Amino acid sequence: MGKKKKKRKSSAFKIILNVFLSIFLVAGVAFGGIVFAMIKTAPPLNVQQVLTFDEPSILYDDKGQYMDKVITNEQRIVVDYKNVPQNLKNAFVSIEDERFYKHHGVDIKRFTGVILINVTNKIKRSSKLQGASTLTQQLIKNTVLSSEVSIKRKVQEMYLSIQLEKELSKDEILGAYMNSIFLGGNALGVEAASKQYFNKSVKDLSLIECAFIAGVPQSPSVYYPYSSASKKNPSIYLNRTKTVLYKMLDNGYITQNDYNKALKDLDSKKLVFAKPSAPSNKLAYEWFSIPAIEQVKKDLKTQYKYDDKQIHNLLVNGGLKVYTTMNKNLQDKTQNTINNAYYLNSYKSNGMIYPQASAVIMDYHNGEVKTIIGGRGDQPARSYNRAASYNYLRPAGSSIKPLTVYSAAIDSKKATAATGFEDSPIPNNIGRKYSSGAPYNPKNSPDIYYGYVNVREALMRSINVVAVKLVDKIGLNTSIQYAEKFGIPIDQHDRSSIASLSLGELHKGTNPLIMAQAYGVFGNNGTYTEAKLYTKVVDRTGKVLLEPKTNTKKVLSPEAAFITYDMLQGPVSESGTGPQANFGNMEVRGKTGTSSDMKNLWFCGLTPYYSAAVWIGNDNSSTVDGVYSSTAARLWGDIMKEFHVNLPYKQVQKPASVVTANVDRISGKLPTQLSYRDPRGSTVYNEFFINGTIPTEYDDIHVEAQINKLTGKLASKFTPSFLVESRVFLRRDYSPGVELLDQQWLLPYSIDEGGSLPPTEEKNNSNTRDKNKDKNKNKNKDKNPSQDKPNNNNNDNNSNNNNNNNDNNNNTKPPENDSNQNHEDNKNKQ
């Protein structure tokens, strides 16, 4: 019986043992299968991914110098392993992975010990759990895997760590770890942490500073020295630092003396942190960098079809190198010039300096923009970019005239530089075309009218009514077409507004970047070159992602471009509106602009090297006091002077197809003998023309008549012969209703002692000279209005014949005629 019982017990034990062994075997096989499945679904190990870190893109200037870095919420500065002090390397190994140089990716001894400790803590219901990740595992987690807490992720982490140890050396792994680890605040990597905490490079860290940084990864928020808890109780991070130092001593990385001195330094409060600062969200060269980044975004979307999220990630984390066209030296000088322009009559309001000013300078030959200044004085981050933003557009005033009026008329061959107009109030039959109510009747400012002028002089003096008459002649549609060719934003309101197209009273407006591109056409044979803000974008591997071509389009014929360029010397002449723009002996061309009520002041122009535009105004669109468009010309000249230092004199070359001819500056027609006998001197000069546009008719404004030289009246049969004198006059067959400055040179209507008028004038017998002088009698104001009667006047700015200046015939020096320009504008030509 006893033996049978023993046999039964033994048999039962074997059965139970076999069952348990079977269970364990099945469980082991199952567990192994699960682990194998987890490993099989692990992502492939990409060593390059491990060694590549998220970095913001960097912008460089046109000389390859560092300029700006794309702003991110976190800062990383990748540092070379050889520049990391040995103390910091040893500190990380001591506190994070003391058997780092012995294991092959996974520390089995530590892993087993941690499991036992964590199981014990669970049984005791303790919340204290320990981690067993090696530095290699942490690197895999930071660069390849997500931060998900799961058995699957842990198994994959261990597997990939073992694989990584086969591919990289220990130094490469440790170096990658120190560049990838989060170290509190905004710091990713040891270099960013060193800058954040101690305002120094990592290579300059002391032993206690190294120990502090190595202690942070365990709990970055707890050991953050700028937190309120740490400020109240510094022992939180000091004790952690001492623990790191002890581990370094225990592992033989520092001596007992080093350890003792380090503790003494900590107790003596020698662990000093830099003053905390909020992360800046302002770029160093914000005016230029933001438009450049926007252009890169646009091109990435066009070329690679990336969506906005992909583009954002690439710029923020992709470590791109963006080589811009900005010249840092000239950008700094231009900013300084605008900030310190004492003649801007500056004042402060709500901490901001006013008036504000902006400028753009570009090489119109290749489109490279060299300077963008979006404002003056201290500005908050992402402030108005008054130079380049399409959200900050302002009316251009008369600076639009060369674009939508004069070059448009010449290029379309509907007028020439010599075409004559009468500077006099707009006739009602024209005014009614552009107004449903009272006739449109813009005025010169102040109320001065020159009488007969040609197109060249009208541009020089910026005469408003002539610009309106010329747009009426070429048609709104033609003017609109050229505005769009030049890149001027035109909306539906502008399309039906002659004020927008002839006087620059645009509904939305323009900005200096738009105007600098447009004015470059005149020096570039009529070719518009699109602004280019960068030349190349390279990814972190050195591959060129973007290399934009120079985009151009034809706007004007070379002939029309050159003739307009030549005409633009008028506004910067002493008789023009902006002579202050001149500097040195450089060839300068340009045009002032003033919008209504002196709210926006402009100067746009070019040299044979660069085109540039300057704007002055207030952000609230209020009147700018004590500053004029001539001030904008002065600022333009001061800026451009710096751009042309050591550049040789140069000229824009005249196309061979541009022809010249002698014409009468009063009528714009071929001269007669009377043209040489104008009472103010010869009105014959040599003008540029597009071939085929030289006038064929002869001057009909000058007339000759015999007068009584004593009374100035027309001679008659009653006039004594010794008082009869033959003189040359100007004819005007109607009364303009206002006094014109050339009125004193008109053919007299009064007859000496009775008699009859010359036969050609009999039709105007009712219009006597005395009636013309009476400003209060305007019965004949709209009788026979002369819309496009060929006229002319002084043209001292023509490059081929600058004689016969008529300015000396009047004591009153005429002011600029920008829309509502204050008469004081001309008093400020300093």
Swiss-Prot record:
Segments traversing the membrane: 19-39
A GO biological-process term: regulation of cell shape
Enzyme Commission identifier(s): 2.4.99.28, 3.4.16.4
InterPro entries the UniProt entry points to: Beta-lactam/transpept-like, Glyco_trans_51, Glycosyltr_51/Transpeptidase, Lysozyme-like_dom_sf, PBP_transglycosylase, PCN-bd_Tpept
Annotated stretches, region: Transglycosylase: 57-229
Family per record: In the N-terminal section; belongs to the glycosyltransferase 51 family. In the C-terminal section; belongs to the transpeptidase family.
Protein name: Penicillin-binding protein 1A
